[in-house]
Amino acid sequence: MSTKSYSERAAAHRSPVAAKLLNLMEEKKSNLCASLDVRKTAELLRLVEVLGPYICLLKTHVDILEDFSFENTIVPLKQLAEKHKFLIFEDRKFADIGNTVKLQYTSGVYRIAEWSDITNAHGVTGAGIVAGLKQGAEEVTKEPRGLLMLAELSSKGSLAHGEYTRGTVEIAKSDKDFVIGFIAQNDMGGREEGYDWLIMTPGVGLDDKGDALGQQYRTVDEVVAGGSDIIIVGRGLFAKGRDPVVEGERYRKAGWDAYLKRVGRSA
């Protein structure tokens, strides 16, 4: 795992998206990504306004929104991202051949490449998925974009481990600029070959151990000590009975303290 500070890594990173994110993390003292799966745009924007000061990254699933529109959802979302200084990660999990994912990324109702700083993909279809998504981004925007590969998942019974994970890492090596890291539960290495991948870890909780649908939670200290750079937290921030302000600061501090411990810095 990396023991360098976020700012040190930002200064040397090949990806402008990764460098921007790492600098935001250092500036805001946050490695918290909020995962907000809600059905209404108004609820999404309300939660983003409240949680914005505590996060470095917002993870969305815009296809869950029942009232999505570019003008009423994406425009205000981008304004909030600028106001609160966080990036946006649309958790699309692309998993098709290169030409198809290129169209899915750039076209249709959501036009993800136009507004999402980061997206992600499965490695099951091979390296063509990376090339297709990169080409799509270059065709529709001058803004830098980044891709995460899904190397490991937090759900019970996931098939993303072992040989599959190793194969996904090899696919990530096909593009040093566009692929910025992984969705993973552990460090994915690569530093000795010149890669500085960001590791983002879902299934992080300070209280619950899991849910009835197979999600398994690990502690903040556990995942950061194991190599995670960004903790992804969803219902722990805004579920019924939880105050997003209290939980946002609680998880931000827990994640930051764990990072300081890993790199040998004091608060």
Swiss-Prot record:
InterPro entries: Aldolase_TIM, OMPdecase, OMPdecase_AS, OMPdeCOase_dom, RibuloseP-bd_barrel. It catalyses: orotidine 5'-phosphate + H(+) = UMP + CO2. Pfam families: OMPdecase. One of its GO terms (cellular component) is cytosol. GO terms for molecular function: orotidine-5'-phosphate decarboxylase activity. Pathway: Pyrimidine metabolism; UMP biosynthesis via de novo pathway; UMP from orotate: step 2/2. Substrate binds at residues 37, 59-61, 91-100, 217, 235. CDD domains: OMP_decarboxylase_like. Its EC number is 4.1.1.23. GO terms for biological process: 'de novo' pyrimidine nucleobase biosynthetic process; 'de novo' UMP biosynthetic process. Keywords: Decarboxylase, Lyase, Pyrimidine biosynthesis. The active site is at 93 (proton donor). NCBIfam families: pyrF. Belongs to the OMP decarboxylase family. This is Orotidine 5'-phosphate decarboxylase. It comes from Kluyveromyces marxianus (Yeast). The lineage of its organism: Eukaryota, Fungi, Dikarya, Ascomycota, Saccharomycotina.
